[in-house]
Amino acid sequence: MNKTELIHQVAERTQMSKKDAGEVVNTVFDVIAESLAQGDSVQLIGFGNFEVRERAARKGRNPQTGEEIDIAATKTPAFKAGKQLKDAVK
């Protein structure tokens, strides 16, 4: 399912227009992204948790030259599924 299909499903199930459903879906995504950008986690009980994880600096290799390079530490968004979501998928 892509974003357009998600908006269509939300519109059908809530009797909203596709435009309104699209605004709701986009707003939810924006709020999650803004919270993560501020360093907060988003906990949706039964669904899962969105959080920012830090990846430590590490050594790597340039595959073309074999030269060892330093890879800087980074922050990356992560999602961990909740129990209800895991059970629904089984």
From Swiss-Prot:
InterPro entries, per database record:
Hist_DNA-bd (IPR000119), Histone-like_DNA-bd_CS (IPR020816), IHF-like_DNA-bd_dom_sf (IPR010992)
Name positions with the PTM Phosphothreonine.
4
The GO annotation for biological process reads:
chromosome condensation
Q: Can you cite an annotated GO cellular component?
A: cytosol
Record flagged with keyword Iron-sulfur: no
Keyword annotations for this protein?
Answer: DNA condensation, DNA-binding, Phosphoprotein
**Superkingdom, natural source:** Bacteria
Entry's SMART domains? BHL
Quote the Pfam families the UniProt record gives. Bac_DNA_binding
Transmembrane region(s): none
Gene Ontology terms, MF aspect = DNA binding; structural constituent of chromatin
Q: Which Gene3D superfamilies does the UniProt entry name for this protein? A: IHF-like DNA-binding proteins
Q: Does the keyword Isomerase apply?
A: no
Report the function annotation for this chain.
Histone-like DNA-binding protein which is capable of wrapping DNA to stabilize it, and thus to prevent its denaturation under extreme environmental conditions.
Tell me, how does this one assemble? Homodimer.
Family affiliation: Belongs to the bacterial histone-like protein family.
Q: What is this protein called?
A: DNA-binding protein HU-1
